Amino acid sequence: MKKIIVFTFFLLGLSTAALAQEGMKSMAEATEADKTAAIPSDSYLKRGAPIGKAEKVSLSKVLAEPAKYAGRTVLVEGVIVRSCKMEGCWAELAETKDSKSVRVKMKDHAFFIPLQSAGAMARAEGVVSVKTLGKAQVDHMIAEDGAKFENRNADGTVSEVSFEATGIELKSIKPGS
């Protein structure tokens, strides 16, 4: 009887460990094809879930009243002014290349955009949030990715409006347009 109980606990432990390993795999890794995909000028390069029927809101409205849009699924459009150079897991999106931007992260790190996405037009659907980034994270983002933050708090943290995209579409801007 003792052996059966010990064996049962052993199997239970193995199954728990196996399930924990599966949970760790939820974050995908960017492939070379993800990183180097060409962004078309006559159609959209689509990543993540298809764009749905979320309310379209201008980035200027989101940035002016972030609390109004926090937690809501919306569609935003703009130009990518900067993006992750390691995997393509985030981008900064602005209405124009010289306007204030919002950081767009790809939901659950499950899809990626090309590393050379800066300058492309983008449509992204997802959820707006207001977050405080820790000093270590801010320092890392500045050092590794050249991120820019307008208002850094005295303790080195940053409060920022961010956007978690469930889907994103990219289109190259034709020269002269």
Please place each PLM-identified region on the residue numbering.
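OB-fold and OB-like single-stranded nucleic-acid-recognition modules
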Residues: 21-177
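Sec-dependent N-terminal signal peptides
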Residues: 4-13
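Sec/Tat signal peptide C-region and signal peptidase I cleavage site
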Residues: 16-20
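Hydrophobic alpha-helical membrane context
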Residues: 14-15, 94
